[in-house]
A protein has these predicted regions:
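Basic, flexible Lys/Arg- and Gly-enriched helix-loop patches that mediate nucleic-acid binding at interfaces
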Residues: 1-243
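N-terminal, intrinsically disordered charge-dense segments
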Residues: 261-265, 283-296
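Short, positively charged and aromatic/hydrophobic N-terminal segments
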Residues: 242-245, 252-256, 260, 275-277
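Cationic, low-complexity basic patches in intrinsically disordered or flexible, solvent-exposed regions
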Residues: 250, 257, 266, 270, ...
Length: 296
């Protein structure tokens, strides 16, 4: 494969722009500057860098972005700043698109990929990929919310939501942790509107278990995920099954992810709060080390 062909398929640059960059010495192959656009490269055998950044040679690219407020999760809303603007040009492939969406005023982890099949798996409810949120409510959490969410909320337009897991954050009366397995438009906000409350702040912490527990991405930053990370995302329900069937297992995982990403000490405390009521199916209490070993 020609060098310019390889780069064209994996960046947003045109062939003409890439040839100019190659001639200016901005491209290296295995550490050596290459100035010929027709240089032969093999994605699986060579390391190609553009402007000092390694270009992913895999067929598909998976990028995890910590979305800040003020950006929309699409590329075609006129006059709006897109999350794609936060991805370095060397990583932004032509078909790179967000998987699902976070609205403009929300923050959180957003997966971007050019793998259409994986995107469908994550978005579709039948894919069973969990999505985790930390929310702040305008009014205090009410005891009846948990039962309503677990039964499935009916939205104002009549749409029926799948059952959701939820729990208030200890030592607060307006913060909660939410776990969904679907992605309707503005779903979390609409669910609490149906309950007579309002979501003031919303942050999505991760999809599934996508290596978030090992990342501390600042707002606006992104990183490339490995194929292994992506498989963790798709197998999150299998991982959950290792824990007790009668325990709030999704929140144990979510709390730990949240505290690692955001450095939120109160959510770290929430993790240990859930640990205190966390028991195995035979009634044997897990040690804190056992739980952490399974999370990381």
């Amino acid at each position: 494969m020609r060098l310019d062909q390889f780069l064209s398929a994996r960046t947003m640059y045109s062939r003409r722009e890439l040839r100019q960059m190659i001639q200016k010495g901005k491209v290296t192959v295995d550490g050596a500057v290459v100035r010929k656009a027709d240089q032969a490269v093999q994605p699986e055998a060579h390391t190609v860098c553009l402007n000092g950044r390694e270009i992913c040679g895999d067929q598909y690219l998976y990028v995890l972005l910590h979305k800040p407020k003020g950006y929309v999760s699409s590329a075609d809303e006129a006059g709006q700043k897109s999350v794609l603007e936060l991805v370095p040009p060397e990583l932004c492939r032509k078909d790179l698109r967000p998987v699902g969406r976070l609205d403009k005023d929300s923050t959180g982890m957003l997966l971007l990929t050019d793998d259409g099949q994986l995107a469908h798996q994550v978005i579709a409810a039948r894919g069973h990929v969990a999505k985790y949120y930390h929310i702040v409510l305008a009014r205090p959490w009410e005891d009846g919310y948990l039962q309503s969410l677990e039964q499935g909320i009916t939205l104002a337009d009549g749409a029926q939501c799948l059952p959701a897991k939820a729990a208030p954050v200890p030592d607060t009366d307006r913060e909660a942790l939410i776990c969904l397995h679907e992605g309707k438009y503005h779903q979390v906000r609409r669910m609490f509107a149906a309950l007579g409350n309002h979501v003031s702040e919303l942050a999505r912490d991760c999809n599934g278990r996508t290596c978030c527990c090992r990342l501390e991405l600042p707002l606006g930053a992104c990183c490339v995920l490995s194929e292994k990370d992506v498989q963790k995302l798709l197998k999150c329900e299998t991982d959950f099954a290792r824990f007790a069937t009668n325990a709030p297992k999704s929140f144990v995982i979510m709390d730990k992810c949240t505290s690692r990403i955001l450095g939120n000490k109160r959510l770290e405390k929430c993790f240990y709060f859930w640990y205190d009521i966390y028991v195995t199916g035979n009634g044997k209490r897990l040690s804190r080390g056992d739980v952490l070993e399974n999370l990381i």
